[in-house]
Swiss-Prot record:
Na(+) is not transported, but it plays an essential structural role and its presence is essential for fluoride channel function. GO terms for biological process: cellular detoxification of fluoride. GO terms for cellular component: plasma membrane. It catalyses: fluoride(in) = fluoride(out). The gene is fluC. The keyword Disulfide bond does not apply. This is Fluoride-specific ion channel FluC. Its main location: membrane. Fluoride-specific ion channel. Important for reducing fluoride concentration in the cell, thus reducing its toxicity. GO terms for molecular function: fluoride channel activity; metal ion binding. Na(+) binds at G75, T78.
């Protein structure tokens, strides 16, 4: 149990630091769409897609790795709470169209990245 807890802890900490770095690096690039949060969410969606496809196919892998990557790293990297707050800030500033665009890009982009990663990994491992 302690090993599983440490896997989530290490993955979550690493993902959180990665999200902070992406936010610091990319959020200043655009005033309406927080690109760091978007980048973190899209990368996390892709990683979780690969992870889920990998763990579905490789059932012998220690569950600790699934916890480290999906629950830990992706949980720390992706952030619905920050995304939600950024949408609220855009709405408070009266930038309704940008808020709606931010919602659409984050939601559709995350779904697309997860599906793409799952499909790519499944196709590659079938050969």
């Amino acid at each position: 149990m302690l090993q599983l807890l440490l896997a989530v802890f290490i993955g979550g900490g690493t993902g959180s630091v990665a999200r902070w770095f992406l936010s610091m690096r990319f959020n200043p690039m655009h005033q309406a769409i927080p690109l760091g949060t978007l980048t973190a969410n899209l990368i996390g969606a892709f990683i979780i897609g690969v992870g889920l496809a990998w763990f579905n196919r490789m059932t012998h892998i220690d569950p600790m790795w699934k916890l480290l990557i999906t629950t830990g790293f992706c949980g720390g990297l992706t952030t619905f709470s920050t995304f939600s707050a950024e949408v609220v800030f855009l709405l408070q500033d009266g930038r309704i169209n940008w808020a709606l665009a931010n919602i659409a890009v984050n939601m559709l982009g995350s779904f697309a990245m997860t599906a793409l990663a799952f499909w790519l990994f499944s196709a590659a491992s079938a050969h």
